[in-house]
Amino acid sequence: MKKSLKIIIPVVVLVVIALVAGFFIFNGNDAKKFDKEYSVGEDNPFVYRNAKEVVDILKNGTGVVYMGFPECPWCKAYVKMLNETAKEKGMEKIYYLNIKNDREKNTKEYQEIVELLRGKLAYTDEGKERVYVPYVAFVVNGKVIDHDSETSDIKEDITPDQYWNREQKERLQVKLGTLIELVNKGSICTDCNK
């Protein structure tokens, strides 16, 4: 018995160490990849998720879900503020979905995301709801408690740098910070939009 314990315990310890190391390496790869796409630094909290995984988070999870794509200049500007606020508030993970492909192909998962966000999306000229980006959803126990998509459908001729002046940035970061704190606590805000 003692002999088998001497073998089993080191094996279990090695497996646990390998799993923990794998977790950090995997998360580090997401952060590096995200930094290459968005230039936010490698110490960012963004972890990649596919559309199916985002559907599951929206249905059952708790967290912050950011949807965008790196070719979008509004997304690049927005994500820097989201990243900064998330780090200030101790948010360890923000789930990221590059939604461009799913949206263009109108995949089953994209349609499900639209259905789960019904009433929290902008409309196309044809009157259909659509995920315009940048879009961030704040989810607690499978309930979207709030979202932000302020610059997802800007129609005027303005650049992100022109739009995001100091006051606009501060206002957004206060809103994001409040919602991140609620997600971190697992709370539901009933008057966040007031």
Regions found by a protein language model. Name each.
Residues 45-62:
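A short beta-strand-turn-helix
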Residues 1-45, 194:
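N-terminal targeting signals for export/organelle localization
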Residues 74-91:
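Typically the conserved alpha-helix immediately C-terminal to a functionally engaged Cys/Sec
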Residues 126-194:
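Non-catalytic, surface beta->alpha helical segment in thiol-disulfide oxidoreductase systems
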Residues 40-49, 67, 91-116:
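Thiol-based oxidoreductase modules, predominantly thioredoxin-like and allied folds used
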Residues 60-65, 90-93, 140-141:
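Loop/turn elements at helix/coil->beta-strand transitions in domains of secreted/extracellular proteins
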